[in-house]
Amino acid sequence: MKAQFAILVISMMLLQLIVQTESGFLGNLWEGIKTALGKRGLRNLDDFQDFLDSDTSDADLRMLRDMFR
């Protein structure tokens, strides 16, 4: 019974340690995963579909010329 209680206490302490490392490496890794796979991250990937469009209009060409002046 004492061994089970000790294992429970140690596992709770380790879990608390993992949870509190939000500002460390695991936190940065989790934030990167959330931004890449989250709703906003996936929605932002849709913006790149415009680059694959083969139809370029005169307005698109004018915008590109203005952008690279």
Swiss-Prot record:
Q: Any keyword Signal?
A: yes
Name residues in a coiled coil. none
Q: In which tissues is it expressed?
A: Expressed by the venom gland.
Q: Where is it mostly found?
A: secreted
Q: Where is the signal peptide?
A: 1-23
Residue numbers covered by the propeptide annotation in the UniProt entry: 38-69
Family, according to the entry, reads as follows:
Belongs to the non-disulfide-bridged peptide (NDBP) superfamily. Short antimicrobial peptide (group 4) family.
By what name is this protein known?
A: Antimicrobial peptide Eval36
Organism listed in the record: Euscorpiops validus (Scorpion)
